[in-house]
């Protein structure tokens, strides 16, 4: 079962992973009232469809004030997005996730999945975040690190250190990385997921 990004963020928060503040909107009524929970002046408006490639199809927009935010939400609702994963018919935008924007200095890719061959959990990490990971795997396989861990009650710190090796993090960033990786590990096991991915 695929879930929407806003649902995945709720699960990540439930398991202690740091995430940006955001809200999901299912219609365009009383938008200003709904947006009051958001604090920053910069926002990311994200169409919620079950397909990758939303950004290239116009389904992810950065806006810098509440007026433009309301306008962008109204324009995006009901729009049909066509991406490399939707087919020609595309997918209609029926819900939108609005998130407080973060200053991006670096983008990373991190996922964990069940490796059936070894009966272990495989963590895949890359410094090439924000991109199509399949393309990175094909064009720059040296930019991807895979580390397999035993299925246990919790992940060992020595494993986490190996997983975050490519990221070159400072002490504070490592604290957040530990929380995120521990959350991914627990979500994969407790939610019986086949893949948990952050890109």
Question: Model-predicted segments: where are they?
Answer:
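Catalytic core of tubulin tyrosine ligase-like
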Residues: 19, 66-86, 163
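Electropositive phosphate-/nucleotide-binding environments in soluble metabolic enzymes
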Residues: 2-6, 25-28, 63-70, 104, ...
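Hydrophobic alpha-helical hairpins/lids featuring a short glycine-rich hinge
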Residues: 83-148
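Gly-rich Lys/Arg/Thr-decorated short loops/hinges at beta-loop-alpha junctions or inter-strand turns
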Residues: 13-14, 54-55, 142-145, 155-165
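ATP-grasp fold ATP-binding core
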Residues: 5-8, 12, 39-54, 83-103, ...
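Glycine-rich phosphate-binding loop of ATP-grasp-fold ATP-dependent ligases
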Residues: 20-22, 45-72, 109, 132-133
């Amino acid at each position: 079962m695929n879930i929407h990004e806003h649902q995945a963020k709720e699960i990540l928060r439930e398991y202690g992973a740091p995430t940006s503040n955001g809200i999901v909107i299912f219609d365009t009524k009383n938008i200003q009232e709904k947006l009051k929970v958001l604090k920053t002046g910069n926002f990311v408006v994200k169409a919620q469809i079950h397909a990758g490639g939303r950004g290239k199809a116009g389904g992810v927009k950065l806006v810098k004030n509440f007026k433009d935010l309301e306008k962008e939400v109204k324009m995006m609702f009901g729009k049909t997005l066509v991406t490399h994963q939707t087919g020609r018919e595309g997918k209609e935008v029926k819900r939108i996730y609005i998130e407080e924007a973060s200053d991006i200095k670096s983008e990373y890719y991190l996922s964990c999945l069940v490796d059936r061959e070894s009966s272990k959990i495989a963590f895949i990490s890359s410094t090439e975040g924000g991109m199509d990971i399949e393309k990175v795997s094909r064009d720059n396989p040296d930019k991807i690190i895979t580390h397999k861990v035993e299925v246990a009650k919790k992940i060992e710190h020595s494993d986490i250190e190996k997983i975050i090796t490519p990221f070159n993090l400072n002490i504070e960033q490592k604290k957040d990385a530990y929380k995120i990786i521990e959350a991914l590990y627990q979500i994969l096991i407790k939610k019986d997921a086949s893949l948990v991915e952050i890109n």
